[in-house]
Amino acid sequence: MDQIAAASNGRTINVEGLSKEVLRRLGEIVAQAEAGPQPVQHDGFYEMPIPIGISVRHVHLCPEHVAILFGEGHNLSSYQELYQKGYYAAREHVMVVGRKRCIEAVRVLGPTRPYSQVELAQTDALVLGLKLPIATDGADPASAPITLVGPEGAVTLPGKGKGGAFIARRHMHMSDITARKLGVKDRELLDLHIDGPRPTTLHGILVRIQAGWRDEVHLDTDEGNAVGIRSGQTGTLMIPVRA
Protein backbone atom coordinates (compact mmCIF):
# COMPACT_ATOMS: atom_id res chain seq x y z
CA MET A 1 0.00 0.00 0.00
CA ASP A 2 1.63 3.29 -1.18
CA GLN A 3 -0.21 5.65 1.16
CA ILE A 4 -1.05 5.47 4.87
CA ALA A 5 -3.42 7.83 6.70
CA ALA A 6 -1.73 9.73 9.52
CA ALA A 7 -3.56 8.88 12.75
CA SER A 8 -3.30 12.37 14.20
CA ASN A 9 -4.80 14.55 11.48
CA GLY A 10 -5.99 12.31 8.69
CA ARG A 11 -3.20 13.32 6.29
CA THR A 12 -1.81 10.65 3.97
CA ILE A 13 1.88 9.82 3.73
CA ASN A 14 3.39 8.57 0.49
CA VAL A 15 5.50 5.78 1.96
CA GLU A 16 7.09 4.76 -1.34
CA GLY A 17 8.08 8.34 -2.18
CA LEU A 18 9.43 8.92 1.33
CA SER A 19 11.50 5.73 1.17
CA LYS A 20 13.01 6.74 -2.17
CA GLU A 21 13.94 10.18 -0.81
CA VAL A 22 15.57 8.66 2.29
CA LEU A 23 17.59 6.27 0.12
CA ARG A 24 18.62 9.11 -2.19
CA ARG A 25 19.88 11.22 0.71
CA LEU A 26 21.70 8.26 2.24
CA GLY A 27 23.36 7.67 -1.12
CA GLU A 28 24.55 11.28 -1.19
CA ILE A 29 25.96 10.97 2.34
CA VAL A 30 27.83 7.76 1.46
CA ALA A 31 29.19 9.29 -1.76
CA GLN A 32 30.44 12.36 0.11
CA ALA A 33 32.10 10.18 2.75
CA GLU A 34 33.84 8.05 0.14
CA ALA A 35 34.98 11.14 -1.77
CA GLY A 36 36.69 12.43 1.36
CA PRO A 37 37.50 16.06 2.19
CA GLN A 38 36.97 18.48 -0.67
CA PRO A 39 39.73 20.86 -1.83
CA VAL A 40 39.44 24.64 -1.48
CA GLN A 41 41.00 26.94 -4.07
CA HIS A 42 43.22 29.67 -2.60
CA ASP A 43 46.09 31.76 -4.03
CA GLY A 44 46.66 29.56 -7.06
CA PHE A 45 46.45 26.26 -5.18
CA TYR A 46 43.88 23.67 -4.31
CA GLU A 47 44.25 23.11 -0.56
CA MET A 48 43.02 19.65 0.38
CA PRO A 49 42.93 18.16 3.90
CA ILE A 50 44.71 14.83 3.80
CA PRO A 51 45.21 12.13 6.47
CA ILE A 52 48.80 11.37 7.42
CA GLY A 53 50.14 7.92 8.23
CA ILE A 54 53.41 7.62 10.14
CA SER A 55 55.24 4.53 8.90
CA VAL A 56 57.23 2.67 11.55
CA ARG A 57 60.10 0.48 10.30
CA HIS A 58 58.72 -2.55 8.52
CA VAL A 59 59.40 -5.30 6.01
CA HIS A 60 57.68 -6.47 2.83
CA LEU A 61 58.40 -10.05 1.74
CA CYS A 62 58.12 -12.05 -1.45
CA PRO A 63 56.58 -15.57 -1.19
CA GLU A 64 60.00 -17.24 -1.54
CA HIS A 65 61.39 -15.36 1.46
CA VAL A 66 58.27 -16.04 3.55
CA ALA A 67 58.98 -19.76 3.07
CA ILE A 68 62.66 -19.37 4.01
CA LEU A 69 62.03 -17.24 7.09
CA PHE A 70 58.89 -18.93 8.44
CA GLY A 71 58.87 -22.39 6.88
CA GLU A 72 57.64 -24.01 3.69
CA GLY A 73 53.91 -23.57 3.17
CA HIS A 74 53.64 -20.70 5.66
CA ASN A 75 51.23 -17.88 4.81
CA LEU A 76 51.28 -14.43 6.38
CA SER A 77 48.41 -13.91 8.82
CA SER A 78 46.68 -10.58 9.37
CA TYR A 79 47.11 -8.89 12.75
CA GLN A 80 45.52 -5.54 11.90
CA GLU A 81 44.06 -4.00 8.75
CA LEU A 82 45.81 -0.87 7.49
CA TYR A 83 44.20 2.31 6.19
CA GLN A 84 44.62 1.17 2.60
CA LYS A 85 42.12 -1.52 1.64
CA GLY A 86 43.70 -4.94 1.18
CA TYR A 87 46.86 -4.14 3.16
CA TYR A 88 47.57 -5.34 6.68
CA ALA A 89 50.10 -5.58 9.47
CA ALA A 90 50.97 -9.27 9.75
CA ARG A 91 51.49 -11.20 12.97
CA GLU A 92 54.95 -12.19 11.74
CA HIS A 93 58.15 -10.38 12.74
CA VAL A 94 61.78 -10.68 11.66
CA MET A 95 65.12 -9.52 12.99
CA VAL A 96 66.98 -7.01 10.82
CA VAL A 97 70.76 -7.42 10.96
CA GLY A 98 73.07 -4.47 10.35
CA ARG A 99 76.82 -3.95 10.50
CA LYS A 100 76.86 -2.76 14.11
CA ARG A 101 73.66 -4.01 15.70
CA CYS A 102 70.38 -5.80 15.11
CA ILE A 103 66.80 -4.61 15.47
CA GLU A 104 64.45 -7.35 16.65
CA ALA A 105 60.72 -7.79 16.11
CA VAL A 106 60.40 -5.72 12.94
CA ARG A 107 56.84 -6.07 11.68
CA VAL A 108 56.07 -7.71 8.33
CA LEU A 109 53.35 -6.08 6.24
CA GLY A 110 51.12 -8.00 3.86
CA PRO A 111 50.23 -9.13 1.35
CA THR A 112 53.40 -10.50 -0.22
CA ARG A 113 55.16 -8.63 -3.03
CA PRO A 114 57.24 -9.63 -6.05
CA TYR A 115 60.43 -8.72 -4.15
CA SER A 116 61.38 -8.13 -0.52
CA GLN A 117 62.31 -4.78 0.96
CA VAL A 118 63.07 -3.18 4.33
CA GLU A 119 61.85 0.36 5.02
CA LEU A 120 63.69 2.16 7.82
CA ALA A 121 64.06 5.65 9.24
CA GLN A 122 67.43 7.38 9.39
CA THR A 123 67.51 6.76 13.15
CA ASP A 124 67.17 3.02 12.50
CA ALA A 125 69.96 3.15 9.93
CA LEU A 126 72.29 4.77 12.46
CA VAL A 127 71.50 2.08 15.04
CA LEU A 128 72.27 -0.64 12.48
CA GLY A 129 75.41 1.08 11.26
CA LEU A 130 74.11 1.42 7.72
CA LYS A 131 74.22 4.25 5.21
CA LEU A 132 70.92 4.01 3.39
CA PRO A 133 69.56 5.88 0.37
CA ILE A 134 66.22 7.63 0.18
CA ALA A 135 64.21 5.61 -2.33
CA THR A 136 60.68 4.73 -3.39
CA ASP A 137 60.97 0.93 -3.20
CA GLY A 138 63.34 -2.03 -3.13
CA ALA A 139 63.60 -2.01 -6.91
CA ASP A 140 65.54 1.25 -6.71
CA PRO A 141 69.15 0.66 -7.89
CA ALA A 142 70.39 2.44 -4.76
CA SER A 143 68.73 0.02 -2.30
CA ALA A 144 71.25 -1.49 0.12
CA PRO A 145 71.99 -5.13 1.03
CA ILE A 146 70.59 -6.31 4.37
CA THR A 147 70.00 -9.59 6.24
CA LEU A 148 66.70 -10.78 7.72
CA VAL A 149 66.38 -13.55 10.31
CA GLY A 150 63.15 -15.42 11.01
CA PRO A 151 62.22 -18.39 13.20
CA GLU A 152 63.00 -20.90 10.43
CA GLY A 153 65.87 -19.33 8.51
CA ALA A 154 67.68 -16.25 7.26
CA VAL A 155 67.94 -14.43 3.95
CA THR A 156 70.18 -11.65 2.68
CA LEU A 157 68.61 -9.15 0.32
CA PRO A 158 71.18 -8.19 -2.34
CA GLY A 159 70.19 -4.55 -2.81
CA LYS A 160 71.02 -2.70 -6.04
CA GLY A 161 67.47 -2.90 -7.33
CA LYS A 162 66.91 -6.57 -6.46
CA GLY A 163 65.28 -5.98 -3.09
CA GLY A 164 67.00 -4.30 -0.17
CA ALA A 165 66.89 -1.65 2.53
CA PHE A 166 66.23 2.05 2.13
CA ILE A 167 64.73 5.13 3.78
CA ALA A 168 61.29 5.58 2.27
CA ARG A 169 60.80 8.78 0.35
CA ARG A 170 57.91 10.85 1.68
CA HIS A 171 54.99 10.01 -0.56
CA MET A 172 51.24 9.79 -0.81
CA HIS A 173 48.76 7.25 -2.09
CA MET A 174 46.12 8.92 -4.25
CA SER A 175 43.04 7.42 -5.87
CA ASP A 176 42.61 7.76 -9.62
CA ILE A 177 39.37 9.65 -8.95
CA THR A 178 41.11 12.34 -6.90
CA ALA A 179 43.94 12.54 -9.41
CA ARG A 180 41.57 13.14 -12.32
CA LYS A 181 39.57 15.70 -10.39
CA LEU A 182 42.66 17.75 -9.51
CA GLY A 183 44.73 17.08 -12.62
CA VAL A 184 47.52 15.37 -10.67
CA LYS A 185 49.91 13.06 -12.52
CA ASP A 186 51.55 9.89 -11.22
CA ARG A 187 54.96 10.62 -9.62
CA GLU A 188 54.23 14.34 -9.45
CA LEU A 189 55.79 16.18 -6.49
CA LEU A 190 53.53 18.21 -4.19
CA ASP A 191 53.89 20.18 -0.96
CA LEU A 192 52.25 19.35 2.38
CA HIS A 193 51.58 21.95 5.06
CA ILE A 194 51.29 20.70 8.63
CA ASP A 195 49.94 22.76 11.53
CA GLY A 196 50.60 21.93 15.16
CA PRO A 197 53.32 22.51 17.76
CA ARG A 198 55.94 22.69 14.99
CA PRO A 199 54.13 24.03 11.92
CA THR A 200 56.02 23.38 8.72
CA THR A 201 55.73 22.72 5.01
CA LEU A 202 57.23 19.52 3.61
CA HIS A 203 58.25 19.67 -0.03
CA GLY A 204 58.61 16.89 -2.56
CA ILE A 205 55.72 14.59 -1.60
CA LEU A 206 55.85 11.92 -4.32
CA VAL A 207 52.36 11.08 -5.61
CA ARG A 208 51.57 7.47 -6.44
CA ILE A 209 48.21 6.90 -8.12
CA GLN A 210 46.17 3.71 -8.20
CA ALA A 211 42.51 2.86 -8.63
CA GLY A 212 40.84 2.03 -5.32
CA TRP A 213 43.44 3.67 -3.12
CA ARG A 214 42.43 5.93 -0.26
CA ASP A 215 44.14 9.31 -0.24
CA GLU A 216 46.87 9.32 2.42
CA VAL A 217 50.35 10.80 2.92
CA HIS A 218 53.08 8.55 4.34
CA LEU A 219 55.93 9.97 6.44
CA ASP A 220 58.45 8.01 8.50
CA THR A 221 58.88 8.24 12.27
CA ASP A 222 61.76 10.73 12.06
CA GLU A 223 59.65 13.11 9.98
CA GLY A 224 56.63 12.64 12.22
CA ASN A 225 58.66 13.34 15.37
CA ALA A 226 60.31 16.37 13.78
CA VAL A 227 56.97 18.09 13.19
CA GLY A 228 55.20 16.65 16.25
CA ILE A 229 52.44 14.63 14.59
CA ARG A 230 51.06 11.11 14.86
CA SER A 231 49.21 8.76 12.53
CA GLY A 232 45.65 9.82 11.88
CA GLN A 233 46.28 13.55 12.04
CA THR A 234 45.78 15.64 8.93
CA GLY A 235 47.84 18.02 6.85
CA THR A 236 47.00 20.26 3.91
CA LEU A 237 48.07 19.09 0.47
CA MET A 238 48.95 21.95 -1.89
CA ILE A 239 48.04 21.25 -5.53
CA PRO A 240 48.79 23.93 -8.16
CA VAL A 241 45.72 25.07 -10.08
CA ARG A 242 46.21 24.31 -13.76
CA ALA A 243 45.09 26.91 -16.27
Region locations from a protein language model:
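Short, low-complexity, charged amphipathic interaction modules
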Residues: 1-40
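Short beta-strand-centered segments at strand-helix junctions
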Residues: 51-99, 104-187, 191-195, 203-234
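C-terminal functional extensions of proteins
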Residues: 232, 238-243
